[in-house]
């Protein structure tokens, strides 16, 4: 007895899979089957050209979206739907929220897992807040791009006073930053500073709930979140020297990936890159970590030169060392400027200063 005839759908399916037998022409009623398979194949072919790795906080996502939008605007092939994908990665710093950063220990608390994903090929580029990036980069990675720097100043946020100077003695200021803590206590020793972690929204909620009387946040982050109006006032750089690379976004890729390097180089803002390099060299010489209050700021002055200021302090604000430099706005000169300033403060502080911070 001959075998029963195949249904048209089965025949079409085997034909599409490359079956050596084709027993009958697909009937017209099977066209939707072929069309569905074709659409699925086309969708699978649209693989993202760039996968952006980022933390999942609202601010980190805002920075990733800014990067994506700049890439799409600069390169027409990336403007296609799905060409750029954002991949959220949770870092150690995101997972441990009940301890001060200084107590967690180690470097790269907000970058290591993202860099690991980059090296493993799970993402193509990594978007970081430069202030979170250790002074050394993992082997096999490169950071060819800094986006234009945002406002480097800190914002003072309070429901009852317009500035730190107006806070009554004994007022509690919330901050997870030893840099901010040391400078606050140096100028206002009557205030109390307590550990205050969480993303921007969490900290603002805690402030409204009365956990603290005031807090300080990076103005750059508030601006990127369209929340600048949240600031009660803005502290000048003279009042509060910013963190190294504050307000700067850095984008890393694998050092072997020429395609990504070319994409990122097209977005690089050279003035920012040079300023960040100067500040990070200062930090590198001091071998700063989460237990060391360090601040630095390099900028182009009205004459086009680099103006640099650096600070090293004890967490309680009882000891503060400061230095400044001016020189041509040139990469090699600025790196040397940061290095020289770091060595100056390291010598002023002496080895005992750093031993006491361990």
Swiss-Prot record:
GO terms for molecular function: hydroxymethylbilane synthase activity. Its main location: plastid. Binds 1 dipyrromethane group covalently. The keyword Chloroplast applies. Belongs to the HMBS family. NCBIfam families: hemC. This is Porphobilinogen deaminase, chloroplastic. It comes from Oryza sativa subsp. japonica (Rice). The gene is HEMC.
């Amino acid at each position: 007895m001959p075998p029963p005839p195949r249904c048209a759908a089965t025949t079409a399916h085997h034909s599409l899979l490359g079956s050596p037998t084709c027993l009958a022409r697909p009937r017209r009623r099977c066209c939707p089957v072929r069309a569905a398979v074709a659409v699925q194949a086309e969708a699978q072919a649209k693989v993202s050209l760039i996968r952006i790795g980022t933390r999942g906080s609202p601010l980190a996502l805002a920075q990733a979206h800014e990067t994506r939008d700049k890439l799409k605007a600069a390169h027409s092939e990336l403007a296609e739907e799905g060409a750029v994908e954002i991949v959220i990665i949770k870092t150690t710093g995101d997972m441990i929220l009940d301890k001060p950063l200084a107590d967690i220990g180690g470097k790269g608390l907000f970058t290591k897992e993202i860099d690991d994903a980059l090296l493993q090929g799970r993402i193509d580029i990594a978007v970081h807040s430069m202030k979170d990036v250790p002074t050394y980069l993992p082997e096999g990675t490169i950071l060819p791009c800094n986006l234009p720097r945002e406002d480097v100043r800190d914002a003072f946020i309070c429901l009852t006073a317009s500035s730190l100077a107006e806070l009554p003695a004994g007022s509690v200021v919330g901050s997870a930053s030893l840099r901010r803590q040391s400078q606050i206590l140096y100028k206002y020793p009557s205030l109390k500073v307590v550990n205050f972690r969480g993303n921007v929204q969490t900290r603002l909620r805690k402030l409204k709930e009365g956990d603290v009387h005031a807090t300080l946040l990076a103005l750059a982050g508030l601006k990127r979140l369209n929340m600048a109006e949240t600031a009660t006032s803005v502290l000048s750089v003279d009042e509060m020297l910013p963190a190294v690379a504050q307000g700067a976004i850095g984008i890393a890729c694998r050092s072997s990936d020429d395609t990504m390097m070319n994409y990122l180089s097209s977005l690089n803002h050279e003035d920012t890159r040079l300023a960040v390099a100067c500040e990070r060299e200062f930090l590198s010489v001091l071998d700063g970590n989460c237990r060391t209050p360090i601040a630095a700021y390099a900028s182009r002055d009205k004459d086009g030169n680099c103006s640099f200021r650096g600070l090293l302090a004890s967490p309680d604000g009882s000891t503060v060392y400061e230095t400044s430099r001016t020189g041509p706005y040139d990469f090699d000169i600025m790196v040397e400027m940061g290095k020289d300033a770091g060595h100056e403060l390291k010598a002023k502080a002496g080895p005992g200063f750093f031993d006491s911070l361990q």
